[in-house]
Amino acid sequence: LLVASGWRQLEIDGDNAYARERIAGEQTIFDAATALPLAEVTEHVLAALGFVGVAEGAGLQLLGVPMPAALKDLAESGLNFEQLRERRAVPLRSVFPDLAGDVVLVDPGVESEVLEAGRWLEADAEARLVADALDGGAAAAVLPYGVYRLTRTAVDTPDASETWPLGTEIHLAPGDAFAVTAPVAGVVAVATDRGVLLDLRNGWTLSIDGVQAECAEGDEVDPGTRIASLPARDATRPVAVTLCRADALEGATPPILALDVPDEGRAQLVAPERVAAWSRFTFDPSALLSIESRTQRDESGDEQARREQIFASAQERYYDRPMQIERGWRHHLVDTTGRAYIDMVNNVTGLGHGHAGVADAVNRQIRILNTNSRFLYRELAEYSERLLALLPENSDLDTVLLVNSGSEAVDLALRLAQAATGRKTVVSLREAYHGWTMASDAVTTSAYDNPYALENRPDWVHVADVPNQYRGTYRGDATGAKYAADLGADLDALATQGRDVAAFICESVLGNAGGVLLPEGYLADAYARVRAAGGLCIADEVQVGFGRMGSSFWGFEQSGAAPDLITIAKPMGNGFPIGGVITSKRIADALSSQGQFFSSAGGNPLSCRVGLAVLDAMESEGLQENARVVGARLADGFRALAARHDLIGPIHGEGLYLGVELVRDRESMEPATAEAAAICERLRELGVVVLTTSERSNVLKVKPPLCLTSESADYVVAALDRVLTEGW
């Protein structure tokens, strides 16, 4: 209706700009809706409106759940569920009465324990799962109906893979010929050398695909009637059993029955976005086959509601309607429907998700010893020495204090600086984020995380100007001296007020701004001025350090600066909670004036062993170099897009900490905040997880695991290009 009226309006008034602008979007909606059969679209609409389908209602009846009268009528017009209940017996014997031996249900799902370490990406992953079951002596291996198959998940693709099977797939071990019997009564509708289709005379059909028919079309059969045979076989043979509404078969896209397609004997699959309809068109045949039902639905909405019941409103989350992530591998995340996403935001898992070395380290150490750091064990010193060895050659830092997070690390660093100087005042930069503890939050000034950040700083915190080359008081790289001079003026003013500075804290790269590099010379000059004023310099490397810059291990090395204290965390444990402060013994020993320091879990054997595994992997896998190479490729790709799309402003950062700033006008620098949010949503639809940052929420933050490949980087650039070209 919208399309027709739109075109009619343009016929009447061809200069109607509003109608011409709207017609393109309305035509897109129309084309998408008409690309599927009407029956399927109808079921999607009914599902969205909350109407329970025949199959769903019948399923409730099968489970013994009372049903409303209207649903009961629908269910009674469908399958004879009492008949199904009576057929419960030895697995698969209702179809293969001569089958002898165990039947194994194979788990090809997203949370399958046998698909770890990226095994699911192998082309023959599914076949190997079946082979493993049969090699173990099983007579049949079953891939269940309705279980989203991780084995069918493809990565770096704009469309979700077809992962949800419409039938049960049975793989039979090599052996002699089998008789095939009807598990329910019906009329033979199709009989070929590829399978049999039974009309159950109630609006439903049952297909058994991958067998040779021994019946004729029109034959009436009872439960147990021989209808086909499975020939003798030297190799594994698949047979698919599908319960489907008759009205879904005609014109179905794709064909639902395996006998309609060349890949005989295998259940057909649909993409997650089509499950709402096809779960109403099909039904789980497990009861017919006397096997366990494992049907899955996308329950992310229920999981989100469950979380909201126990979460505080202040606790952050990604996306208003988030996907439910239950697996990760390297730089990919996979949701419960088998949809894969490139993870472009997870700087916590620097090595990548599911890293075997970290998992093995945890498994081994937790079985041997895990206690607190007041006991003597070798892992603590070994890990601390490895961290110190990563410092620049001229560094005089020689002491490590381990905690459990970046917030704790910043909190401890501030306490150390105040103890060592005997002063209280701390200078932090505007628009900075440093943590959530009392002290680390006090020096956090970002309105992005706290809209009231600048209104409620304690009196011991002084906020200095942020040296943002793009949006700051001074613009361009040759502004470091000006920003440093302004900081020096702040320090002088504080001294005049009797507020001598204890510490100056800043990120070595402006992470919260989207990876904005500090102006040349700023950090070294700022450190010199702080030290001249008697203060100490804290480099917050929690986000930007640990190899992410590519050209250097630490962010402060980019500026040729040497901090007095370094805070580290996020990637240290690849998701395992580890944080720390690296400093000098002179500064660390000052803490004794305030009592003893101890962290129950900080520096325990398990944390240290994980930390060592991370460092080993970073070295053996060349991840810092990968960050340099792939990061440069990404940045070049984004800059090439900027030449074609005016919405892209500057590309910030280095290595694999980048920011793509979106602006409505490059001269005025008006932030494209709404556009950035919409683009992130559209990128998610295309299989890329990227989110916004900065005070204006208009910068796409790019900080993926350091194992990001060139192929995935190219896909991200192409996806962003597509969104900017087609719209969002």
Model-derived features: positions:
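Charged- and aromatic-enriched interaction segments used to assemble
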Residues: L1-K72
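Short, charged/polar, Gly/Pro-enriched secondary-structure boundary elements
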Residues: M67-K72, A248-A252, R666-M669, S710
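Acidic, glycine-rich catalytic/binding loops that coordinate metals and/or anionic ligands
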Residues: D73-W120, A216-D219, S229-E292
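Short glycine/threonine/proline-enriched tight-turn/helix- or strand-capping micro-motif at secondary-structure
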Residues: S112-T181
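Zn2+-dependent peptidoglycan hydrolase active-site motif and core
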Residues: W164-T168, P174, T181-E214, R237-A240
